[in-house]
UniProtKB/Swiss-Prot annotation:
Residues 765-1083 are annotated as: Nuclease activity, interacts with RecD and RecA. It comes from Mycolicibacterium smegmatis (strain ATCC 700084 / mc(2)155). Its cofactor is Mg(2+). This is RecBCD enzyme subunit RecB. The lineage of its organism: Bacteria, Bacillati, Actinomycetota, Actinomycetes, Mycobacteriales. In the RecBCD complex, RecB has a slow 3'-5' helicase, an exonuclease activity and loads RecA onto ssDNA, RecD has a fast 5'-3' helicase activity, while RecC stimulates the ATPase and processivity of the RecB helicase and contributes to recognition of the Chi site.
Length: 1083
C-alpha cells in the first residue's frame, strides 16, 4: 500500500480516498494538515469543508487541532524562520502573500467551519432541508430513549403475555433486555428470518418487531427523536437519485473528511455515500485495527466495504507516539497478524522517536512480559480471584519500584500520572485500583460505575426521605448516619432522643434552604457544617465527595428542569436507582486531578497515550454465551434474537474474538516507551487477546486463532512458546515474583501558594426575587416541611381567606362550589386558561382537552368533564368597567398575551453600590398617587410599616403575568385566582365574591403589590413594543378574576361590578413613578 505524503498531490476532485492509519501515526495531524493545505492553496474555503468524527470530545479536539494548525501556518508565513514542521516549511516556499490572506480569512471565519459529530452534522442538515427532509422543527432530541422503551415493554409485555396462565416464553427481564438491545442496534437485520410460528424464536422475534414498531409510533406522538433517528431520516431524504437534499449538500460541501471512519455504521456510511461519493472530494481516515465499538453499533464490515470501493487507498507510515525500541518489539509480535480477518492486518510503521526516552527504570526493557508460574508439571488453572490478588500486588510492587527509582522520561522524573493501567473489564480495574491504594500509590479510576448506584446517591435518598417526614425518628436516624451528618450507630445510641431532635431540626432548616435557593443549598449547608472536612479524612474520601457533588448537581438540574420539589426529587431518585439509563451524566466523574496512576478500560484509553502502560489481565478473557448474538451474514449486520443456535453462536464467537484481538492491539499501542504485561494460566486464558497472539500462534504466522489450543498447558510448554517470541525480538520474559513495596512519597506542595482571603462585604440587599419572594422574605414563621408537588405550584393563592364583609348580590350557586381547593388545583386551572382557545367552536371540548393534557403535571382528584363544565361559565361572565360589554369568550388569542414572563433589574441589577428603594417607598407612592376613596388605598399602611416595609428592592425581579388583554386601545392585566371566599358550611355562591369581600381578599393576600408590579411590567413591555406608547392612553388597569365567583351571563352585578371580577385601575402616573423607583431613580 502506498504511504501517504502530506506534502504530495492533494486528493483529486470528486474522488474517494481512504487513509489507513495505525496507532500513533498522527491521523488527526494529517487531517488538520490537509485542511490547511486545501485552504492555503485556494482549493476551497473553510466553510466549504465538512469534517466529521464520531464523538463530541473528538470533534472538539479536531476543531482545536485544525485551528492550531492554521495559526501555526500563519506564524510561519509571517516569519519563515519559525516554521516548525515539514508542512509549514512547504507552505512558505511559494505564494506566501495569497496563502497568508486565505488562512487569515479562514481564521476570521473559523466559527463557520462545520466540524461536527455525525449526529450534529445530521441535525444541521435536517434543519436546513426543511420540507426536503423528514424533519419537524418542533421535535425534541433526547440523549436516551431508555424510559420510553421501558414504558413500551411494560405495555407490550402485558398485551402479549398478560392473559397466559402458564409461564410466558419470555420473562420480563428478558423482554426488557431484548427491547433495549434491538433498539440500540438500528440498521441491523433481526434473525432468524422465518422461525416456526409456534416456536420460542417466533415469540421473541415478534416481540422485538412490535417494540420497534411501537417505538416509532410513540416517538412521533410525543415529538421526540433519538440520535439514531437523525441518521435514518437523513438517509431516507437522500435515497432518491434526484433528491434535493443531495444537491444542497454537494453544493455546500465540495470537500468532506471523515475521521475515525472505522467506527462507522451502515446508516452513517449510507448518508455519506449517498450525499458525497463521486460528487465531492471524500477523504476517509481510520484504522480498522482499532475498530472496537461493535457494541455501540460500529461496523467494521462497513469500513472494509467502503475501503474496497475507494479510488485511492494509502497508509500513514510514521509512528509519532512510541520509541523505536518499543515499536520494534511490538512489531515483532504484531507484524502481519490478522485482527479479525485478512483485510485487517498489522503493517510495519517507522518510528519518529529513535531513542528510548525512559531512562533509569529498574527494568528498562520496552516490552516486558511477567509470567505467573505454577509447580513443575502442573497444568491445573489458577483461579482468577487468586490471580487478581497476586497480579494486583505484583503490579503495585513494580509501579512502586519505578516511582521510587529516580527514573526519568524525557528528562523529567517519572510521576504517577505518567503511568496507565489498562484492562478490559471493570472488575479487573477495580482490583488494580484497590491494590494500588493499599500499597499507598495514588491512583484514580472512574470505571463504568453509575453514580446513582453509589453510596452518595443512597445517602441523598435517605436525606430526601427524612425531609419528607422529619417527625419519624427512624428516617431521621437513617439520615443522621449518612455522610451529611456522619453519625454512627454508637453515637446515635449515646445521643438518644436529644441527638435525633437536633438532626430533625437541622433537616427542617435545610429543607427551607432548598425551597429558597435550590437543592445545592443543602450541600452548601452541609459543607459549612463540616461535612467536607470529615468525609475527606476517610479512606476514599475524594471519591465520596466527588459523588456527593455530582449527585447534588444532578438533583439541582432536575429540580430546575422539571420543577420538582423535595418529595418529587425523592421519587425521581428512587426510580433512577432502580433503572439503569444510558445518559452520559450517570457516569461517575474523576475524583482527583492530582498526579496519580490512571486506571481505565481499553475503550476509554483509545486515543490516549502514556509513557508507561501496564496490561495486567490482557491474557484473560471471559467469553459468555449470549442469548442475543451480533454477527454478519454475507456482509449484512444481523442480530439473532431467537435463542440458542450453534451456527450463530460460532459466528458470534469468531467476531467477538476479532474484536478482542483489536482491543489487545489498542492496549499495547497506548505506550510511548514501555509496556508491561502479564501471562498466567487462568481458566479463560485460552480466550485472552494477548494469549491468542503469543501462545496461539508462532512467529511468522498471520492467523490469530479464536482460542488457544490446547486449552490447558504446562508452564514449561507455555514458556517455550512465549520465549519463541522473545527470540524473535518480542517481549522480555520475566518471572512474576512480588517485590517489596515502598511507599511513594507525595508530590511536594508548591511553596508559593496560599489561600486567598475574602475581605469584601457581601451585599445582603441584592437578590433575585419575585412578588412571592418579597412576601416570604418578610415572614418570621419557621420553615415547615410537607410533601411537595412534582412541578412547582403557584404560591400566590390561599385556599381559605378569612373574610368578614357581608355577601352581596344574589345567591347564584358557584359552578365550582364542589370542586377541590389547593395549590395543585389552582395551578391546573391556570394552565388550562393559559392554553385553551376561547374562540373554539366547542369550548367545553376544548377545555377538556387541555385539562387532560395539563393533568399529567397537575394531578387533581376531579373529573375532566366536571371541571370543563365548571370553567365554561366564567368565559361568559361580564368583565366589568375595564372591559365594558365584553367576556373572556369574546377576546380571542390574537387579542390576549398569555403568560408574559419577565425579569428586569432593580436598582441597576448587577451594578455595585448606589441607592435602592424599599417596599416602604412603594407605600409612600401609594399615599401620594391613590385617591382616598380608592378601595386599596389603605394598603399603603401595610407597605410602610413592619418587616415587609424594609424589604430591599435591589437585584432582579422575575415572574409571569397570567394574561394581558387588548381592549380597544387599552391593555388590561389579568390574574386568575381560585381562592375560596366562602364562610361557614354554606354553599359557595356568587354573593361570596362581591366587591367588598374581594377587596378584603386582595388586602389579606398582598395582591395590590402584585398588581402594581405587574403594571410596571406591562408599562415597560409596551414602551418597548408599542409605537407611540402613552401610559395614560394604553394602560388599562388590572382584572383579578376570582373564577369561583364567575357564574356566567347571570352573574350578579352590584354598582357596575360583576361578582368574581375585581377591577382596579391604578393611576398611570403611579405606575410610571413606581417603574422609576425600581430603577432607583427619583420618581
Amino acid at each position: 500500500m502506498k504511504v501517504f505524503d502530506l506534502l504530495g498531490p492533494l486528493p483529486a476532485p470528486n474522488t474517494t480516498t481512504v487513509l489507513e492509519a495505525s496507532a500513533g501515526t498522527g491521523k488527526t495531524f494529517a487531517l488538520a494538515g490537509l485542511v490547511t493545505r486545501f485552504v492555503a492553496e485556494g482549493v476551497a474555503t473553510l466553510d466549504q469543508m465538512l469534517l466529521i468524527t464520531f464523538g463530541r470530545a473528538a470533534s472538539q479536539e479536531l476543531r482545536e487541532r485544525v485551528r492550531a494548525q492554521i495559526v501555526a501556518a500563519l506564524v510561519a508565513l509571517d516569519d519563515p524562520s519559525r516554521a516548525c514542521n515539514d508542512l509549514e516549511e512547504y507552505l512558505v516556499k511559494t505564494d506566501q502573500q495569497a496563502r497568508r490572506r486565505r488562512l487569515r480569512d479562514a481564521l476570521a471565519g473559523f466559527d463557520a467551519a462545520t466540524i461536527a459529530t455525525t449526529h450534529q452534522f445530521c441535525q444541521i442538515v435536517l434543519k436546513s432541508l426543511g420540507v426536503a427532509g423528514d424533519s419537524d422543527a418542533g421535535v425534541t432530541l433526547v440523549e436516551s430513549l431508555d424510559d420510553l422503551v421501558s414504558e413500551i415493554v411494560d405495555d407490550l409485555y402485558l398485551a402479549h403475555f398478560g392473559g397466559q396462565k402458564d409461564d410466558p416464553e419470555l420473562s420480563y427481564p428478558e423482554a426488557l433486555k431484548l427491547a433495549r438491545v434491538v433498539v440500540g442496534n438500528p440498521a441491523t437485520q433481526l434473525r432468524p428470518r422465518d422461525p416456526d410460528p409456534d416456536s420460542p424464536a417466533a415469540v421473541r422475534l415478534k416481540f422485538a418487531r412490535d417494540v420497534l414498531a411501537e417505538l416509532e409510533i410513540r416517538k412521533r406522538r410525543r415529538g421526540v427523536l433519538g440520535y439514531d433517528d437523525l441518521l435514518t431520516r437523513l438517509a431516507d431524504a437522500l435515497e432518491p437519485e434526484d433528491s434535493p437534499a443531495r444537491v444542497r449538500m454537494q453544493q455546500r460541501w465540495p470537500i468532506v473528511m471523515v475521521d475515525e471512519f472505522q467506527d462507522t455504521d451502515p446508516v452513517q456510511w449510507q448518508v455519506i455515500e449517498r450525499a458525497f461519493s463521486g460528487r465531492s472530494t471524500l477523504v476517509l481516515i481510520g484504522d480498522p485495527k482499532q475498530a472496537i465499538y461493535a457494541f455501540r453499533g460500529g461496523d467494521i464490515a462497513t469500513y472494509l466495504r467502503a475501503a474496497a470501493t475507494a479510488g485511492d487507498k494509502q497508509t500513514l507510515g510514521t509512528n509519532w507516539r512510541s520509541d523505536r525500541a518499543l515499536v520494534d518489539r511490538l512489531q515483532a509480535v504484531l507484524r502481519g497478524a490478522q485482527l479479525g480477518g485478512p483485510d485487517i492486518v498489522v503493517h510495519d510503521v517507522q518510528a519518529r522517536h529513535q531513542g528510548h526516552r525512559l531512562v533509569g527504570a529498574p527494568r528498562n526493557d520496552p516490552f516486558r512480559l511477567r509470567v505467573v508460574s505454577r509447580k513443575p508439571g502442573n497444568t491445573r488453572v489458577i483461579p482468577i480471584d487468586q490471580l487478581r490478588r497476586h497480579i494486583g500486588r505484583d503490579l503495585a510492587a513494580d509501579i512502586s519500584a519505578l516511582l521510587n527509582s529516580g527514573a526519568t522520561w524525557c528528562d523529567q522524573p517519572v510521576q504517577a500520572k505518567d503511568i496507565a493501567v489498562i484492562t478490559e473489564t471493570h472488575k479487573d480495574a477495580r482490583a488494580c485500583h484497590a491494590a494500588l491504594l493499599a500499597a499507598g500509590i495514588p491512583a484514580v479510576y472512574t470505571g463504568d460505575s453509575d453514580v446513582f448506584t453509589s453510596e452518595a446517591a443512597e445517602d441523598w435518598l435517605y436525606l430526601l426521605e427524612a425531609f419528607d417526614q422529619p417527625h419519624r425518628p427512624g428516617l431521621v436516624r437513617a439520615a443522621a448516619a449518612t455522610m451529611f451528618f456522619g453519625e454512627t450507630a454508637e453515637s446515635l445510641a449515646a445521643g438518644g432522643d436529644a441527638l435525633t431532635d437536633r438532626v430533625a431540626d437541622t433537616l427542617r432548616e435545610w429543607a427551607g434552604h432548598a425551597r429558597e435557593r435550590g437543592v445545592a443549598a443543602i450541600f452548601e449547608a452541609a459543607q459549612l457544617a463540616g461535612m467536607g472536612k470529615r468525609v475527606l479524612s476517610w479512606q476514599g474520601g475524594e471519591r465520596l465527595m466527588t459523588d456527593l457533588a455530582h449527585m447534588t448537581q444532578l438533583l439541582q438540574d432536575t429540580a430546575h428542569r422539571e420543577g420538582f420539589g423535595l418529595a418529587a426529587l425523592r421519587d425521581w431518585l428512587r426510580t433512577q436507582r432502580s433503572e439503569r439509563g444510558g445518559e452520559s451524566e450517570r457516569n461517575r466523574r474523576l475524583d482527583s486531578d492530582a498526579a496519580a496512576v490512571q486506571i481505565m478500560t481499553v475503550w476509554v484509553s483509545k486515543g490516549l497515550q502514556f509513557p508507561v502502560v501496564y496490561l495486567p489481565f490482557a491474557f484473560n478473557r471471559y467469553v459468555p454465551e449470549p442469548d442475543l448474538v451480533l454477527f454478519h451474514d454475507d456482509g449484512q449486520r444481523c442480530l439473532h434474537v431467537g435463542g440458542a443456535d450453534p451456527a450463530v453462536a460460532r459466528a458470534g464467537r469468531a467476531e467477538a474474538a476479532g474484536d478482542d484481538s483489536r482491543l489487545t492491539y489498542v492496549a499495547l499501542t497506548r505506550a510511548q516507551s514501555q509496556v508491561v504485561a502479564w501471562w498466567a494460566p487462568s481458566y479463560d486464558e485460552p480466550n485472552g487477546g494477548l494469549s491468542r497472539l503469543m501462545r496461539g500462534r508462532a512467529p511468522g504466522e498471520a492467523i490469530v486463532p479464536d482460542k488457544c489450543s490446547p486449552p490447558k498447558i504446562s508452564d514449561e510448554d507455555a514458556l517455550e512458546r512465549l520465549r519463541a517470541w522473545e527470540a524473535a525480538g518480542g517481549p522480555v520474559i520475566e518471572e512474576s515474583v512480588i517485590g517489596a513495596v515502598s511507599p511513594v512519597p507525595p508530590e511536594p506542595a508548591p511553596e508559593d501558594l496560599a489561600a486567598r482571603k475574602f475581605f469584601r462585604a457581601i451585599d445582603m440587599a441584592w437578590k433575585r426575587t419575585s412578588y412571592s419572594g418579597l412576601l416570604r422574605a418578610a415572614e418570621t414563621a419557621g420553615v415547615g416541611v410537607s410533601s411537595e408537588p412534582e412541578v412547582t405550584e403557584r404560591d400566590d393563592e390561599f385556599d381559605d381567606i378569612p373574610v368578614v364583609a357581608p355577601a352581596e348580590g344574589a345567591d347564584v350557586p358557584s359552578p365550582m362550589a364542589h370542586l377541590p381547593t389547593g395549590a395543585a388545583f389552582g395551578s391546573l386551572v391556570h394552565a388550562v386558561l393559559e392554553t385553551a382557545d376561547p374562540f373554539a367552536e366547542d369550548l367545553t371540548a376544548e377545555l377538556a382537552t387541555h385539562i387532560d393534557a395539563h393533568s399529567q403535571h397537575w394531578p387533581v382528584e376531579v373529573e375532566t368533564a366536571e371541571l370543563a363544565a365548571a370553567l365554561v361559565p366564567m368565559h361568559d361572565t361580564p368583565l366589568g368597567p375595564l372591559a365594558p360589554g365584553l367576556t373572556l369568550r369574546q377576546i380571542g388569542l390574537r387579542d390576549r398575551l398569555c403568560e408574559l414572563d419577565f425579569e428586569f433589574p432593580m436598582a441597576g441589577g448587577d451594578l455595585r453600590g448606589g441607592r435602592f428603594a424599599r417596599l416602604s417607598d412603594v407605600g409612600e407612592l401609594l399615599r401620594e398617587y391613590l385617591p382616598a376613596d380608592d378601595p386599596l388605598a389603605v394598603y399603603a399602611e401595610r407597605l410602610s410599616t413592619g418587616i415587609l416595609g424594609v424589604q430591599p428592592l435591589r437585584g432582579y425581579l422575575s415572574g409571569s403575568v397570567d394574561a394581558v388583554l387588548r381592549v380597544g386601545e387599552k391593555f388590561v392585566i389579568v390574574d386568575y385566582k381560585t381562592n375560596w371566599l366562602g364562610t361557614g358550611d354554606g354553599t359557595l355562591t356568587a354573593a361570596d365574591y362581591g366587591r367588598r369581600r374581594m377587596v378584603e381578599a386582595m388586602l389579606h393576600s398582598d395582591y395590590p403589590l402584585q398588581a402594581l408590579l405587574y403594571a410596571v411590567v406591562l408599562h415597560r413591555y409596551l414602551g418597548w413594543r408599542l409605537s407611540g406608547y402613552d401610559p395614560a392612553t394604553h394602560l388599562g388597569g388590572v382584572l383579578y378574576l376570582f373564577v369561583r365567583g364567575m357564574c356566567g351571563a347571570g352573574t350578579p352585578v352590584v354598582d357596575g361590578h360583576p361578582a368574581g371580577v375585581f377591577s382596579w385601575e391604578p393611576p398611570a402616573d403611579l405606575v410610571v413613578a413606581l417603574s422609576k423607583l425600581l430603577d432607583a431613580e427619583a420618581p
